[in-house]
Amino acid sequence: MTPLLEIKNLVKKYKDVVAVDNISFAIHQGTCFGLLGPNGAGKTTTIEVIEDVVRPTSGEIFYRGQPRRDSFSDEVGIQFQSTALLSMLTVRETLETFQSLYRKTAAIDDLVQMCQLAEFQNQYNDKISGGQQQRFLLALALINQPELLFLDEPSTGLDPQARRNLWHLVQQIKKEGKTIILTTHYMEEAQYLCDEIAIMDYGKIIAHGSPAELIGIHSPEMTVILPQKQFVLDPDQLSMPVRTVKDTIEVKTNDVNACLNTLMSHGVNLSDLTIRSPNLETVFLNLTGRQLRD
C-alpha cells in the first residue's frame, strides 16, 4: 500500500549545524503519527520542511506516491504552535476569511459545531481563552477539508480539562479517516493519540514504532512498590533489583507474577502493594536522557 506521505533521506543544514540528519519514514492514510524529541532534536525543522515552510538541504518528500507539488499546501491543514490573527475580526469572520482562500472548503457551521465554537463565535479573536483559541485554530486548520493535518504542540498551556477536550476532537478527526502528524512534549498525549511514533534526537530518528512496541523494546520492566515497613527481607535474598525510595521499596521485574510469588514465598505482606507499568515517558527519558535542555 502506497503511503500517504513518505520522507526519504531528508537533510537540513544551517551553516555548520545539521538540524535534520538523513532521516526517512512513511505515514499511511488514517494514522496519527507522532514526532517526538527534546528541545533542539530537529522535530520542528522536520515538520517545517515537510510543510514546505523551510527548504530542505537534500532529500525527497512524496505525497500520494508522487513528488510533493505546489498544490500540496492547498491539500493540507496546519495548526501552528501560535498564530497571529487580526484582533478586529470575530472568530466567525476569521473562519469566513480563511474559507474564501480555498476552492474546496468545509461548512463553517459544521466546524463551529465540531470544535464547540458556538458560544464565542461572535467574539473578537483576542477576547477568547486559551482552550477556546486552540479549538478555533484547529477549526482554521480544517477549513480546506485536508486529508493530512499537522498539529504542532496543540495542547501546550492548556489545563487538563481543555487538553482532554482537544484529545476528543483529534479522535473525532481520526475517525473521519484523516491523517495527522502530531508534535507534543506531553508523552501521555502521544501515547493516547498516536498509532505510530518516531523519536528524534540530535537530528536523527533514534526509535520508531507503535507506543506499545516502543515500551516493549525500550522499557519492558514493571515496578512493584511496597511500603518499606512491610518489606522485612534482605534485598540480597531476591534475584531482582531492589531500591529504597523515601519510605517505599521498589522492585523492578519483567515478570510480575513471578515477582509476587517470590515475595509471598518469603512472607512479604502485599496488602498495600501497587504496580507501576512502564509508559512512553519512561521510554522517552531512557532514550534521550533526563538532563534538562534549553
Indicate where each model-derived feature is located:
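Conserved ABC ATPase signature
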Residues: Y124-I128
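Conserved ABC ATPase "signature" region
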Residues: E96, S100, T105-F120
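Catalytic Walker B motif of ABC-type/P-loop ATPase nucleotide-binding domains
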Residues: L149-E153
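Helix-to-loop junction immediately C-terminal to a conserved catalytic motif
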Residues: E51
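ABC transporter nucleotide-binding domain
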Residues: H168-K252
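Conserved ABC transporter NBD signature motif
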Residues: G59-F72
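Short, charged/small-residue-rich alpha-helical element at the C-terminal edge
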Residues: E221-D294
